[in-house]
């Protein structure tokens, strides 16, 4: 009976000496019988090392926070979560002000700035997520490639050398090396002086996010919400 290598490598444990010995034996056998399979130019190696394609822009709906029925100046977190909820569960929130229903649930539980409250409300809708304080650009790329948006917390005021503020936006795609976002308050590119719709699909430079998202540009210091839900 032929074995399925998927099952073997799915359960591979590098801390299990038997697993390690088995892989080493497989390598010895390949060298003796099919040495070309272990070359960098081998087709399976090329396929294995190919990074998954990152989609252009995920179709995440846009909800501005500026028309929220209450606390419009401070409900960026709730409107961002509402956008992702409607992406994962289309039809849950009705109409262009659908995030009002979400905001109402948030304030029934706690405060909009409390990330644990957002986690609880999202889970109540059947969308699992977790808030992390150690994300980097590789995490954004991985999630986007899997078809999942990421909510991140940025410094939206001040200069790049001394950023200030605190704001939540939804990363929905990439354009080259830069990131496409839904910013519920408008666009940081115009200093939030234009219409709020400028935040829909706004392109934020990676070089800017390096200092507005990451702590002093250090990798794995970004705040954000990762979703476990499937589209």
Q: What are the functions of these language-model segments?
A:
Residues 2-111, 175, 195, 200-201:
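Active-site-adjacent structural segments surrounding the nucleophilic cysteine of cysteine proteases
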Residues 43, 52, 56-58, 108, ...:
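Noncatalytic regulatory segments and standalone regulatory/sensor domains
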Residues 75, 79-83, 116-124, 139, ...:
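Extracytoplasmic/secreted proteins, especially bacterial periplasmic and envelope-associated proteins
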Residues 93-139:
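Catalytic cysteine-centered active-site loop
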